[in-house]
């Protein structure tokens, strides 16, 4: 409906999207987020604020799928409304690893823009390391050499970065599209000073720390675009010493598809131009593969020429020797050009490169006719141009090289190569002592071959003989003048009008020289003086070498399309101006906040007084923990309060008995409320409501907590532990360190005949800073929760005598509900690696609620949040044989409850039995348990329904309602499995 581009129905579509944005179903809310950009495209100015408020509501959603779609909507609707991001910043960073891959790209860009707009660039980052000093007077420019330069083999330092280029890149990242038009004219005057008020320090900025911490794991994402986006954040915002972490993930992307490889190389090239030492140690990763496309080969050659060092140039040149023999002669020509660039950068190899290039010129010049081999001609031209580039650095030193090139003119047939050599004749005609004496012979040869030359060569001959005539010595002046006059006569009657025009221009310009008899003769007339100055200005000055930055001065944000096409693509937005956004933290009671609180209530939040940052969680199992405010409902498994009253009757007829019809009625009432319609049930009488429902009896099973026996697991058996046996069992106690920890009781028993000394369990990685996606971020930026230890150290057992046993309590925090924790068992100066496997039943905590609250929460978790599984149960059959005369229904209820509470940490809400059942039929018996997931505080409801006879094996239907689908399904399988397992003992 939102895709119908009619303004007439736009208000209706907006109303529907507004309702769907608050729907209990995640898929519906996600569709609402996807519909917002379509509504925005209709240019509904009067509804612009309402659409932006909906974007804010969806950004505060607890589902990663919705947040990813909301980030896309934010990017297209209001990319500069950073107020919406500021209210949810920490939560968005926290949920970032769980968002779908394509949503992560947009969300990373949004968070980066927010941080730059609010806090500015980081003073310790590469972007600002060259701009003066920081507030403490430390010069980042000096520090960069220590952090990023690579050590040479001889102990020296290689060049670390290009100061001018880094300055230009940092400026380009924050300039708008209009400023790009004038950038080429002011490249040489780029300001390198940033206002210190527009910068921040990572040491005192929690927002920057969180962003870098959340994007670091994404450097190893399966999606290449996500890796590039995360690398862009680290490149722009990370401290100098941390920029290196982007290198290996980017190099890993070079193993992907050809298209991805091309995009990655485009971005790596920018990084390498700014800081060549980043990729210098990894030059082998840029060696050419036979399967690479030509564009990829060209970028790899450019990379190798950029990152070559004195220690790696030998290996790189050996590779280049093989590339020159490649059948693709265009690629071979590019290789020759790369050799010239390497020789220009490194002062130690020009001689070696010159010898090789001269040999290549001789080889190619005698290879045959180039008219049908354009590729071979390209190789020869590039070889000559590379030699020219190396000669420019020190022409006098390479006089012999020039002489060899001049002598090879007769054998070189390629027009472009001949034109380049002839150009060098004119430029270096007065160099040294040998070349001036060769000029007469060379110009005679050029005059003799003028008629058969190509147009570009003829033009260069005309320029060269003019330069030679200007710098001619007295002894050769008359001969050279006659040669010049002869060539000018040939040029005046050439078929090409370009040649004729150039000849007339030069003839008029050199008229003063052609009319004089001696080169040193002074012209008296003012006209001749002016002509002499013009000639000197045109032919006597050398051209300034053009900086490569001037030629390639367009830099765009890493990972963007604009960086590939080298112009601002449609939709490209540079980074905002640093510190251009001022966040008003006092504005906490806005209409948007009220709507978000209402949405949170509809989503079933049990703690409405907490802020929106504490409500977020993933729809599937996440490795990040949410919220810094935790609630504990008790330190042990709980059952209904009525069970603690000894005077309470065993069976009660429930006055608020619940039926399927009434549950459906409640669901309909909730739907009517959501649609802002008044339910029309006020006229119905209670008898009408209860006419079709069946009555249920509420069973009180007493206090079963004392009879619960947690299941024990083996950690180390005596055979592997040299007589040391270690078992562990999960406890229902609440950790006194953090609600994220689980209490585990460990039993150490010495089964050997010798004492065992210094027994301890340790986590070797607990003191290391984890830089992976398993590292969690806790809400409200509470620093005490950012580094929650994985294992609380236990008290060491100094000595364990033979056949002695002792218990220890450890507290662990599992990063994932399915992955085991790797620990190390120390004893007798030995180390044994062990795995402590999590029990899903103890990764939840009891959550006390009434039957009405249970049903209300259950009604809000239908569809994809509800899943069930059937299993069998026979523990009550064994109990009935030992407990004669006990009520059968009570025995079944106690057996099921004990089985559940012995394997999980839950709260028993109620036990209901249909009154109409016969004495032998347990069908319809229903037990309800409630809990919350430790890591996310999300409610998890369990309903067990019984079918079958009391004295036979029962069929159980276990149903779970939970928003975290993956966790709920895994726990469902766990419950179904342990319900089938036989009990160790019946009590």
From Swiss-Prot:
Residues 614-631 have a biased composition (Low complexity). It is a peripheral membrane protein. Residues 603-613 have a biased composition (Acidic residues). Keywords: Cytoplasm, Cytoplasmic vesicle, Golgi apparatus, Membrane, Protein transport, Transport. GO terms for cellular component: cytoplasmic vesicle membrane; Golgi apparatus; membrane coat. InterPro entries: AP3B1/2_C, AP3B_C, AP_beta, ARM-like, ARM-type_fold, Clathrin/coatomer_adapt-like_N. Its main location: cytoplasm. Residues 586-662 are annotated as: Disordered. One of its GO terms (biological process) is vesicle-mediated transport. It is found in: Cytoplasm; Golgi apparatus; Cytoplasmic vesicle membrane. Disruption phenotype: No obvious phenotype except defective lytic vacuoles with altered morphology and accumulation of proteins. The keyword Lipoprotein does not apply. It holds the Pfam family Adaptin_N. Adaptor protein complex 3 (AP-3) is a heterotetramer composed of two large adaptins (delta-type subunit and beta-type subunit), a medium adaptin (mu-type subunit) and a small adaptin (sigma-type subunit). Part of the AP-3 complex, an adaptor-related complex which seems to be clathrin-associated. The complex is associated with the Golgi region as well as more peripheral structures. It facilitates the budding of vesicles from the Golgi membrane and may be directly involved in trafficking to the vacuole. It also function in maintaining the identity of lytic vacuoles and in regulating the transition between storage and lytic vacuoles. Belongs to the adaptor complexes large subunit family. This is AP3-complex subunit beta-A. It comes from Arabidopsis thaliana (Mouse-ear cress). The gene is AP3BA.
């Amino acid at each position: 409906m939102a895709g119908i581009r009619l303004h007439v129905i736009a208000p209706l579509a907006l109303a529907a999207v507004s309702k769907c944005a608050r729907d209990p179903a995640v898929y519906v809310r996600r569709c609402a987020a996807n519909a917002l950009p379509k509504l925005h495209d209709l240019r509904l100015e009067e509804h612009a604020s309402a659409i932006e408020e909906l974007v804010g509501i969806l950004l505060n959603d607890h589902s990663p799928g919705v947040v990813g779609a909301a980030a896309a909507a934010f990017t297209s609707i209001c990319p500069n409304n950073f107020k919406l991001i500021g209210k949810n910043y920490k939560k968005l960073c926290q949920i970032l690893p769980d968002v779908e891959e394509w949503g992560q790209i947009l969300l990373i860009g949004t968070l980066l823009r927010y941080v730059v707009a609010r806090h500015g660039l980081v003073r310790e980052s590469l972007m600002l390391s060259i701009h003066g000093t920081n507030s403490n007077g430390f010069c980042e420019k000096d520090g960069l050499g220590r952090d990023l330069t690579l050590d040479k083999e001889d102990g020296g330092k290689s060049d670390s970065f290009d100061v001018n280029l880094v300055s230009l890149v940092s400026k380009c990242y924050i300039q708008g599209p209009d400023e790009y038009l004038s950038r080429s004219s002011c490249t040489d005057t780029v300001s390198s000073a940033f206002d210190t008020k527009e910068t921040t320090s990572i040491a005192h900025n929690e927002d920057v720390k969180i962003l870098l911490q959340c994007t670091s794991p994404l450097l190893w994402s399966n999606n290449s675009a996500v890796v590039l986006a995360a690398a862009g954040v680290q490149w722009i915002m990370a401290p100098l010493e941390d920029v290196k972490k982007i290198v290996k993930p980017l190099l890993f992307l070079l193993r992907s598809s050809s298209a991805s490889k091309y995009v990655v190389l485009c971005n790596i090239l920018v990084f390498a131009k700014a800081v060549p030492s980043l990729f210098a140690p990894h030059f082998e990763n840029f060696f050419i593969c036979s399967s690479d496309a030509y564009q990829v080969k060209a970028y790899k050659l450019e990379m190798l020429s950029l990152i070559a060092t004195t220690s790696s140039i030998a290996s790189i040149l050996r590779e280049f020797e093989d590339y020159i023999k490649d059948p693709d002669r265009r690629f071979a020509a590019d290789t020759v050009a790369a050799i010239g660039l390497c020789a220009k950068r490194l002062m130690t190899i020009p001689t070696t490169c010159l010898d090789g290039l001269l040999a290549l010129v001789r080889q190619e010049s005698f290879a045959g006719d180039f008219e049908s081999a354009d590729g071979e001609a390209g190789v020869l031209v590039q070889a000559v141009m590379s030699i020219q580039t190396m000669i420019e650095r020190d022409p006098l030193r390479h006089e012999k090289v020039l002489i060899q090139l001049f002598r090879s003119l007769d054998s070189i047939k390629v027009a472009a190569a001949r034109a380049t050599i002839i150009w060098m004749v004119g430029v270096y005609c007065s160099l040294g002592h040998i070349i001036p004496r060769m000029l007469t012979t060379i110009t005679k040869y050029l005059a003799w071959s003028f008629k058969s030359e190509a147009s570009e060569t003829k033009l260069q001959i005309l320029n060269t003989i003019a330069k030679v005539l200007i710098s001619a010595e007295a002894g050769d002046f008359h001969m050279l003048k006659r040669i010049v006059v002869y060539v000018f006569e040939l040029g005046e009657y050439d078929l090409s009008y370009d040649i004729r025009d150039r000849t007339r221009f030069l003839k008029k310009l050199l008229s003063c020289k052609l009319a004089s008899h001696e080169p040193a003769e002074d012209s008296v007339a003012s006209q001749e003086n002016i002509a002499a100055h013009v000639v000197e200005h045109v032919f006597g000055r050398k051209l300034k070498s053009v900086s490569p930055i001037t030629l390639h001065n367009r830099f765009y944000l890493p990972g963007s399309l604009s960086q590939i096409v080298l112009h601002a693509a449609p939709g490209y937005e540079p980074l905002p101006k640093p510190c251009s956004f001022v966040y008003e933290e006092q504005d906490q009671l806005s209409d948007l906040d009220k709507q978000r609180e209402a949405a949170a209530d509809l989503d079933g939040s049990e703690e409405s007084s907490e802020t929106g940052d504490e409500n977020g969680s993933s729809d599937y199992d996440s490795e990040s923990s949410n919220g810094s405010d935790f609630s504990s409902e008790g330190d042990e498994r709980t059952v209904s309060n009525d069970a603690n009253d000894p005077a309470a009757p065993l069976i009660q007829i429930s006055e608020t008995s619940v039926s399927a019809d009434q549950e459906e009625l409640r669901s309909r009432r909730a739907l009517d409320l959501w649609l802002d319609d008044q339910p029309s049930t006020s006229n119905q009488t209670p008898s009408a409501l209860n006419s079709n429902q069946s009555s249920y009896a509420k069973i009180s099973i007493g206090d079963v907590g004392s009879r619960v026996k947690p299941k024990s697991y083996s950690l180390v058996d005596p055979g592997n532990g040299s007589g040391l046996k270690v078992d562990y069992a999960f406890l229902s106690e609440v950790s006194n360190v953090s609600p994220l920890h689980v209490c585990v009781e460990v039993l150490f028993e010495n089964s050997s005949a010798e004492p065992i000394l210094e027994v301890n369990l340790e986590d070797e990685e607990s003191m290391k800073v984890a830089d992976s996606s398993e590292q969690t971020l806790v809400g409200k930026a509470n620093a005490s929760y950012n580094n929650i230890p994985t294992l609380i150290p236990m008290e060491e057992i100094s000595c364990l005598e033979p056949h002695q046993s002792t218990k220890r309590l450890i507290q662990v925090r599992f990063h994932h509900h399915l992955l085991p924790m790797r620990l190390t068992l120390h004893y007798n100066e030995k180390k044994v690696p062990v795995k402590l496997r999590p029990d899903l039943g103890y990764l939840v905590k009891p959550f006390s609620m009434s039957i009405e609250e249970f049903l209300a929460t259950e009604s809000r978790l239908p569809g994809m949040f509800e899943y069930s599984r059937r299993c069998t149960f026979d523990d009550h059959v064994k109990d009935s044989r030992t407990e004669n005369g006990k009520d059968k229904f009570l025995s079944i209820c106690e057996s099921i409850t004990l089985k559940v509470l012995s394997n999980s940490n839950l709260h028993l809400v109620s036990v209901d039995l249909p009154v109409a059942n016969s004495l032998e039929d347990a069908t319809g018996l229903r037990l309800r348990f409630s809990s919350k997931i430790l890591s996310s505080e999300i409610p998890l409801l369990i309903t067990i329904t019984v079918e079958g006879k009391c004295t036979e094996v029962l069929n159980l239907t276990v149903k779970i309602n939970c928003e975290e689908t993956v966790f709920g399904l895994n726990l469902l399988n766990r419950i179904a499995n342990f319900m089938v397992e036989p009990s160790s003992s019946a009590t």
